[in-house]
Amino acid sequence: KVVGTLIQQLGEKVEYQNISAEDQWGALRKGLVHLQVEVWQASMSKDFNKMLKYNYIEEIGTHSAIGREDWWYPDYVEQSCNGLPNWQAINTCSHLFSEDSINGKGVYYTGLWDFGDADIIRALNLQFTITRLSDDKSIWDILKTAVREKRPIMLLNWTPNWTDVRIKGKFVDFPTYTSECESDPSWGINKDLVKDCGNPKNGWIKKTVWTGLKDQWPCVYQLMKNIDFSNEMIAEASALVIADGHSEDKAAEIWMNKYHKNISSWRNSSCSP
């Protein structure tokens, strides 16, 4: 909403497309969608790099924010599970995260995005099963309920995100990611399988646009190049809606008032309203 508002202030019309992460690439290539403000390394880099290779989209910069997407738990879980955040501890304590007293395997909640979690579970022999939820709102609803009940929960989370500033928690400390972990089975502790590591701990968050944006809307293109989000900015934007319950319009208003100095620096004098 913030970026949309800034574009509207340039005198342009804005339409918000509710589109899946998978479908966004074809839409960007065809010009059905014109910009994506946040491309996250762990969940989107494969498709993103493939699209760049064939010049189907244009990359126009990297945010200052450092991203991470991985297994996460609220801090209070450590009271019941010694050894956290070390990944080996979650096997010892897998029963704490179980919904089935028979097999005792823990449940890992995630969305429809492909992080290779099934591969990680196999490669590290984790005593967990995966429950996929339809969207991030469903993940946060389950998290909020667990926190209210102080119940152990393991789920996909990312930073920057609303939990950074509203709920204390930690990422599981898996073996450190390298590119070899995804391609060379001999790398790492499991010599037979790839993905015996976590996701990148210091991932990039990039901006990408339709290749025709610069020619058709040069001022929007320049604005997109100038926009630079910090971790705090992204976390606060998310928290205003998810944790504080503001509408997206009200959250955008509060956010823009808080970061008005940054916004001023993003505007191009020749394009300013």
PLM regions: where:
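Ligand-binding pocket segment of bilobal, Venus flytrap-like solute-binding proteins
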Residues: 33-37, 106-183
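Short, polar/charged alpha-helical segment
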Residues: 1-11, 121
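A conserved helix-loop-strand patch within extracytoplasmic ligand-binding domains
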Residues: 56-109
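Solvent-exposed loop/turn segments at secondary-structure junctions
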Residues: 21-23, 41-45, 76-79, 112-116, ...
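C-terminal functional modules
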Residues: 200, 213, 221-273
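Pocket-flanking alpha-helical
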Residues: 19-55, 142, 162-167
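C-terminal lobe and pocket-closing loops
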Residues: 163-223, 227-228
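A bilobed periplasmic-binding-protein/Venus flytrap-type ligand-binding module shared by bacterial periplasmic
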Residues: 68-80, 202-216, 239-240
